[in-house]
Amino acid sequence: MNRKLFILIILFTFFIFFQISYAVDYSDVFITYKGKDLGQFTLKNSIFEKDKIIVQENDSYILSPVIKLPFCFEECVPSWNVKCSDESSFCVFVRFGKSDSENKLSPWLLMGEWGEMSNYKTLKSYLDKSQIEGKFENPFKYSGISIETDYILSKDKKFDLIQFCFIFNPNYVVEFSSLNISASTQRGDKKLKLYERTNLGKNSYVVVPFRSQGWEDKKISSEICSVVSTATVMDYYGVDIKTAELAKVAYDKRYKMYGMWWRAVQSAHQYGFDGYVRHFRSFEDVKEYIDKKMPVIACICVNKNDIADDPQYETDGHVLVILGFDENGDILCADGGFRKEEDGILSYKREEFEKIWFVNGGGIGYIIMPANKK
């Protein structure tokens, strides 16, 4: 065999092997339970009716099946759509297991609360009273796994089973519409070479009514980027809610913050919207939504020198709305951190946005849409 040809074959084989290894270095999965899928849930003092679960009595619970993920995850981001009155409340618990250990599950951890905040003793009494199998010990940590405000982190990547439990104290009827789970084998995405620049279409975007974080309540203006982004998308679909009003709904009393991911989705659901949080790994993923005229809410993190035009800008967390792609194929956004629309509707170079969203921000985004929109 010709020596040069032999070397080329070896190099080509190595290249293919490297690309395959590179591409499968992490995995993502998005799982949703809604409609008839909710018939798989175990219920107490609740009924499955017309593709929803109706909760009508106190001491009710909804228990998901034990969900088998296709891998042991590092990061899991859940969200849900539960419609309830101002007087109703519920707690969300989660536990984990490994499929090769006789499906033994961990104690329950506290994922979140809606409505009146409870102390840990009361939370434990909810589980005890419901007679759900399982313990409630440390509310936020267990054997290498922890609840990190609005997502689940498993540094050891040793769990591939997950189960959720919703315990309710409804004063009025509560409707449970969906449970959504986005899981990944890694938190950030440092493999930008996976995403070669493709033709995403130029001048392909939606137009939203701009709103600023600083237009209403100045006391919280620096804390409500998630709320403003959610309100912007709701306004785009025709529901104009004051930002300050939505902020009251989205505020988490335990963590004392407005920007929790699942709470953004849950808040919008109170006004007739469905939604979920998920991992995005490429702008091809985004294009699927833009083609349907659906804006995408993105959670970014910016280090100094990440943005060439503003090298001193940095933030450990900011939320804005992706509108689509400008005339250069770069990323067109609505950023409520600006006071004026002419400043807040802006484009990011694709490579820079890849870094601040996919790499630094882990590709976390949420979709808000009118109920029953596909």
Roles of regions detected by a PLM:
Residues 105-157:
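Extracellular carbohydrate recognition and processing domains
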Residues 20-59:
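Glycan-recognition and processing domains
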Residues 72-84:
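A short beta-strand element within beta-rich, extracytoplasmic domains
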Residues 57, 64, 240-373:
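Conserved active-site-adjacent core of cysteine acyl-enzyme catalytic domains
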Residues 55-72:
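Short beta-strands within extracellular/lumenal beta-sheet-rich domains
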Residues 25-40, 68-71, 87, 99-102, ...:
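Noncatalytic regulatory segments and standalone regulatory/sensor domains
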Residues 20-23, 30-32, 159-161, 165-257:
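Active-site-adjacent structural segments surrounding the nucleophilic cysteine of cysteine proteases
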Residues 8-17:
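Bacterial N-terminal signal peptides
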